[in-house]
Amino acid sequence: MADKNERAIKVVAENRKARFNYAIEDTIEAGISLTGTEVKSVRSGKSTIAESYADSRGGEIWLINANIPEYLQANRFNHEPKRPRKLLLHRKQINKLMGAVERQGMTLIPLKLYFNEKGRAKLLLALAKGKQLHDKRETEKKRDWSREKGRLLRARG
């Protein structure tokens, strides 16, 4: 049996550019439907969600363009690396997210792919609005200033 320290949340993939390219409005945790070889490949830590997004098809939400490479030890029963993957959400959550996407022109982007305490694959999904170029520049200036401020405070002692 694993200790409590070993059962902590294990982040496997992170979309680091998402917070720079989008203004995050709301986040929601969703389960993700994976096959056996996909789970093993995700556990190895080689999956990427940097250029992926979520979209609705037939009243369900799907993760599009997420790259989970083929599992090396699997033979002919391997999975397709960029196939759409179903996200597991309650109907109320799906309606809320799709309403925001359709009415307010928002986007669903994944922020993190991780395993929770129970060992289930979860995806932190964000309801976001794309930033304009000047907003990105402003974010970069704020980040640079906060770094510079920290350096100055450390130098003064």
Curated annotation (Swiss-Prot):
Q: Which GO terms describe its cellular component?
A: cytosol
Q: Gene encoding it?
A: smpB
Which HAMAP family does the record cross-reference, listed alphabetically? SmpB
Q: Superkingdom of the source? A: Bacteria
What Pfam families does its record include?
Answer: SmpB
Record's Gene3D superfamilies?
Answer: 2.40.280.10
Q: What are the record keywords, sorted?
A: Cytoplasm, RNA-binding
What InterPro entries does the entry give?
A: SmpB, SsrA-bd_prot, SsrA-bd_prot_CS
GO biological process terms held by the UniProt record: trans-translation
Q: What is this protein called?
A: SsrA-binding protein
